[in-house]
Amino acid sequence: MTDVPVSRLRNFCIIAHIDHGKSTLADRLLQDTGTVAGRDMQEQFLDNMDLERERGITIKLQAARMNYTAADGESYVLNLIDTPGHVDFSYEVSRSLQACEGALLVVDASQGVEAQTLANVYLALENDLEIIPVLNKIDLPGSDPERIKEEIEAIIGLDTSTAIACSAKTGLGVSEIMQAVVDRIPPPADTLDEPTRALIFDSYYDSYRGVIVYFRVISGRISTKDKVLLMASKKSYELDEIGVMSPDQCEVNELHAGEVGYLAASIKAVADARVGDTITLLNAPADEPLPGYTEAKPMVFCGLFPTDADQYPDLREALDKLQLSDAALKYEPETSSAMGFGFRCGFLGLLHMEIVQERLEREYDLDLIVTAPSVIYKVNMIDGQMLMVDNPATLPDPQKRESIEEPYVRMEIYAPNEYNGTLMGLCQERRGEYIDMKYLTTERVTLIYELPLAEVVTDFFDQMKSRTKGYASMEYHLIGYRRNDLVRLDVLINAEKADPLTTIAHRDKAYSIGKGLVEKLKELIPRQQFKIPLQASIGSRIIASESISAMRKDVLAKCYGGDISRKKKLLKKQAKGKKRMKAMGKVDVPQEAFMAVLKLNQTS
């Protein structure tokens, strides 16, 4: 299986925006090369998680090995490394690009070039990959291949004279793509005689065999007899098995430079086999690891709490297990007076957060409360210290701090130009700073804004999509921190501070957010036997308040006429009971209330 000469290997990936047909094209390639039998075929074959199929997105990286007989009669081995297209998962894209020599750039022939496509193309160009433009969905009535070719040339600067038109759905043009992969993507460098180095581009946890590591051999060879050393974690392992994915795992004895495969070595946690780490041989280690890996940094933080306190150990275990397959997920224990014990978790972005939450609820049967997402703020203290704060409730008091800095992103929005005004309005509402506007073609425009990450992480994406009927797409990257007039907005329910509802807001927006918040809570918190005051405060100053009136029992129902003092006595007794109840009473805050905070931050 592995005696393929390096010259007949091709490693490639598919770059595409969400919904441009990447997973469908991958399915078609698997089917056309006979890698997957027709009867086993299902849509989005490489998307293993149910969640991926439902949302129609690729989250975890997959790889597949295909045998293909080219026009010259030679048999080639093609390794397809499937990549996610969503901006949150760009770290997964960057590492899979390092494992390839070429890429298929798939563009929807009716939609044109979108934001994430561009971000990933630039990553691919940085890695010196050979890029083959592919126009997909040409069977659709709205497709306009010539216009899209001009767009690709104008925006990316790629020559599209050899672009391939195809329809992944019907299979049209797929054989031309296979031939182009063989003809135009270079084979891996012939480095069989150099010290063994292999790049880990993905790993997942298998409950029977431990961590399964997907890797690409960059130089030398690896066989089942070898002991391997992971250069970043400095841990060594004996190999249990190595093999290739076609796309089901298939064991082999040896893999050499240029090949893509998997290994199992009873590795206990994914943290020991970090993605981007270099595998080398224990007996003959390489001098230095492969360059270019940076650890994924969480950008968005939120609290996760079980609704039932007894589920806390289960939540810890579930997060431990999820982290085995998701190296970008960070978490630490957190306690809150209102919610009890839970965890503060860090994510790459909002989609990543939603997916982790959904996987916890679905795969581990947990019922969770999620607090409003926040970002990392830099707080400069009066005594000269600098703190990094990811939880608004832990922000120091105003008298102790000198200033707060928040992360800013540079955002590029691509959209048809009739939506210009509404998009500029949206960015303005979110404290955006206009930088530039470029016309890509006569119909499409790029808006460039710099805005606070905190304004982006909640529902900016949803708002952008709804205001442009789904036609706009965006891409952003961090550009640094800026000082702003920010305040901590606390919410008091029945005179008790509710930590999970605390947010950090700009002073100009604080009043409207606070007012909206208490009004929303008034709708969502069920009435109790006693009156509940709801207040929003900045420091000790109350800026907005509402109250939920008490339910009361008619204690006078059994008094017919009679003496007024009898009625007064009963009413007095009731008032006394209510007072005691108010002092002792706990108010349960429903999950919707926490989610309302997110929406409010934005609409104000």
Swiss-Prot record:
Domain tr-type G: 7-189
InterPro entries: EF-4 (IPR006297), EFG_III/V (IPR035647), EFG_V-like (IPR000640), EFTu-like_2 (IPR004161), G_TR_CS (IPR031157), GUFP (IPR027518), LepA_C_sf (IPR038363), LepA_CTD (IPR013842)
GO cellular component, one term: plasma membrane
Pfam family, one: EFG_C
Residues engaged in binding GTP: 19-24, 136-139
GO BP: positive regulation of translation; translation
Keywords carried by this UniProt record: Cell inner membrane, Cell membrane, GTP-binding, Hydrolase, Membrane, Nucleotide-binding, Protein biosynthesis
Topology of the protein relative to the lipid bilayer: Peripheral membrane protein
Keyword presence, Cell membrane: yes
GO molecular function terms noted in the UniProt entry: GTP binding; GTPase activity; ribosome binding
Compartments where found: Cell inner membrane
Domain of life: Bacteria
Chemical reaction(s) catalysed: GTP + H2O = GDP + phosphate + H(+)
Top enzyme class: hydrolase
EC number from the UniProt entry: 3.6.5.n1
Function recorded in the entry: Required for accurate and efficient protein synthesis under certain stress conditions. May act as a fidelity factor of the translation reaction, by catalyzing a one-codon backward translocation of tRNAs on improperly translocated ribosomes. Back-translocation proceeds from a post-translocation (POST) complex to a pre-translocation (PRE) complex, thus giving elongation factor G a second chance to translocate the tRNAs correctly. Binds to ribosomes in a GTP-dependent manner.
Similarity remark: Belongs to the TRAFAC class translation factor GTPase superfamily. Classic translation factor GTPase family. LepA subfamily.
The protein, known as: Elongation factor 4
